[in-house]
């Protein structure tokens, strides 16, 4: 069995909490693919290309990490094609676990060889969610402790674009 995992998410934007979960996954797996989901049900601040660029910049110095985009299809099929033995999911609170548990059971049904691994971030990131980071940043709040400097620059750029319109 492969020691490769995939870490899927919308990552709008990629936060230090996401990075913490990724680093924890790298302590378990030989290789982790960060897979950006192009989710039509979510209205994102950043395009999938912008999110890909941000994640790639944040993880560029991490060994054994690659970044990809799942534009269509099932995550279980992507995991199978990538040769992944695990799907990594970050869980901050019970509310997260309920949804992730359902998804893990469905993915196991679709691809029985894959295991979902739930990882909790450092306690200092348990309240950090991309949605909150976006909202606070767009309102001019300081989110510098919660995102990589490159992501902070991209959030500032988006805020300036919105003000210009």
Curated annotation (Swiss-Prot):
It is found in: Cytoplasm. Pathway: Cofactor biosynthesis; coenzyme A biosynthesis; CoA from (R)-pantothenate: step 4/5. Its cofactor is Mg(2+). InterPro entries: Cyt_trans-like (IPR004821), PPAT (IPR001980), Rossmann-like_a/b/a_fold (IPR014729). One of its GO terms (biological process) is coenzyme A biosynthetic process. It holds the Pfam family CTP_transf_like. ATP binds at residues 10-11, 18, 90-92, 100, 125-131. The keyword Aminoacyl-tRNA synthetase does not apply. It catalyses: (R)-4'-phosphopantetheine + ATP + H(+) = 3'-dephospho-CoA + diphosphate. One of its GO terms (molecular function) is pantetheine-phosphate adenylyltransferase activity. It is an enzyme of class 2 (transferase). Substrate binds at residues 10, 42, 75, 89. The record marks 18 as: Transition state stabilizer. Its EC number is 2.7.7.3. One of its GO terms (cellular component) is cytoplasm. Gene3D superfamilies: HUPs (3.40.50.620). The keyword ATP-binding applies. HAMAP family: PPAT_bact (MF_00151). Reversibly transfers an adenylyl group from ATP to 4'-phosphopantetheine, yielding dephospho-CoA (dPCoA) and pyrophosphate. Homohexamer. This is Phosphopantetheine adenylyltransferase. It comes from Chlorobaculum tepidum (strain ATCC 49652 / DSM 12025 / NBRC 103806 / TLS) (Chlorobium tepidum).
